[in-house]
Regions:
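Membrane-interface starts of transmembrane alpha-helices
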Residues: 14-18, 52-59, 222, 226, ...
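Residue-level recognition of pore/gate-forming positions within transmembrane alpha-helices
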Residues: 23-27, 61-65, 83-87, 91-94, ...
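Transmembrane helix-loop junction
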Residues: 9, 43, 47, 100, ...
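Loop-to-helix junctions at membrane interfaces in multi-pass transport proteins
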Residues: 1, 8, 52, 85-231
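Re-entrant/interfacial helical elements at transmembrane boundaries that shape
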Residues: 5, 248-259
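Loop-to-transmembrane helix boundary motifs in multi-pass membrane proteins
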Residues: 10-20, 254-271
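Helix-loop-helix module between adjacent transmembrane segments
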Residues: 1-68, 141-145, 237-246
């Protein structure tokens, strides 16, 4: 059962209006969402291996499409577990090592970040200006909306019983808090760690999208000569991209093949 189908059954949508609207929303917006994940994969290969962006984009999309369509929901869930583990290890270890090279305490870390603003770590400021109510609402919608995303909810719909459902809810929230907190830590530590590259404005100077990649390369190439370990952590970034893209692709394809097809078939029967 897909999420639009659940809503249709729950609210007795005999005319399939709710089914059609929810399916259309998923297909349109998840195609864009999936495209952004695939674009991130292309940028990763382009930054690490120097492969042409469009070629890298095609390779990443092909790999994800193959195992998603061949294995379906089971393949996506299995690979997501492995990919999530790799991502968590990378998020934990890389900033800790980088922090060790920058400083030993948080205050000196901020001092070495090269930011003069007193509101750098304030939740109520965006740069030097206070955030507006619209920005607060937008940020809350972005964060809280994660819990209602279709590619997340289908995991809960597949759980065996109510007891496991409650346990899974706790695990999911803890995972979100840990991963998003570590993502913020990477940004703060990465700015201080890569400050010489940023100030030098060299060809390899990191953009905001490649800070984590540059942290891994700088640590395991220039600081610690363990390129194999660095490669594994870069795989953690790839795992994050793939685990998002395959889940969204599965939800999108399910909406097309099950929900939209069901509406079209019913329309054809009425005409006949």
């Amino acid at each position: 059962m897909t999420l639009p189908e659940f809503f249709g059954n729950r609210y007795h949508d005999e005319k399939k209006i709710l089914l059609g609207i929810s399916s259309a929303i998923i297909v349109v917006f998840f195609l864009v969402y999936t495209a952004s994940a695939l674009a991130s994969g292309g940028k990763l290969f382009n930054t690490v291996f120097g492969i042409d962006y469009h070629v890298a984009l095609f390779i990443g999309a092909a790999v994800i499409l193959i195992y998603t369509f061949m294995g379906g929901f089971l393949a996506v869930c299995t690979t997501d577990f492995v990919q999530g583990t790799m991502m968590l290890i990378a998020l934990l270890i890389v900033p800790i090592i980088a922090w060790g090279y920058v400083s030993g305490d948080f205050s000196s870390l901020l001092a070495q970040s090269g930011v003069n603003s007193e509101h750098y770590m304030s939740l109520m400021y965006n740069g030097d200006h206070a955030i507006t109510p619209i920005e607060i609402i937008s940020n809350l919608a972005w964060g809280l909306g994660y819990c209602g995303m279709p590619h997340i909810l289908i995991r809960f719909m597949a759980i065996k019983n109510e007891k496991e459902l409650r346990k899974s809810s706790v695990i999911a929230i803890v995972w979100v808090v840990i991963s998003l907190t570590l993502a913020v830590v990477i940004g703060v530590v990465g700015r201080a760690y890569l400050l010489p590259m940023i100030l030098g404005e060299t060809a390899g100077a990191p953009s905001t999208e490649s800070v984590f990649i540059q942290m891994i390369q700088e640590t395991f190439t220039n600081k610690i000569n363990l390129p194999f370990i660095g490669g594994l952590f870069i795989c953690g970034i790839l795992a994050a991209i793939m685990s998002t893209a395959d889940s969204q692709l599965l939800v999108c394809s399910s909406s097309v093949s099950a929900d939209i097809y069901q509406i079209g078939r019913a329309s054809c029967r009425e005409r006949v």
